[in-house]
Amino acid sequence: MARFPEAEARIFRKYICMRCGATNPWKAKKCRKCGYKGLRPKAREPRGGMGR
């Protein structure tokens, strides 16, 4: 996590396309690359990976 709110907003206020993985702006309604409407917010905590 970021140490101060401005940095956290800059890092995490993005959408990720669930089809192609592109990063999109916070106000986006569809993906800028593929046009898919399934966008999710960027994850604030890491997903389970190598250590789990």
Swiss-Prot record:
Keyword terms of this UniProt record: Ribonucleoprotein, Ribosomal protein
One BP term from GO: translation
Gene3D superfamilies: 4.10.1060.50
Entry GO CC: ribonucleoprotein complex; ribosome
Domain of life: Archaea
Molecular function GO labels: structural constituent of ribosome
PANTHER family: 50S RIBOSOMAL PROTEIN L40E, LARGE RIBOSOMAL SUBUNIT PROTEIN EL40
Stated family: Belongs to the eukaryotic ribosomal protein eL40 family.
Record HAMAP family: Ribosomal_eL40 (MF_00788)
Matching NCBIfam families: PRK04136.1
Name of the featured protein: Large ribosomal subunit protein eL40
Organism phylogeny: Archaea, Methanobacteriati, Methanobacteriota, Thermococci, Thermococcales
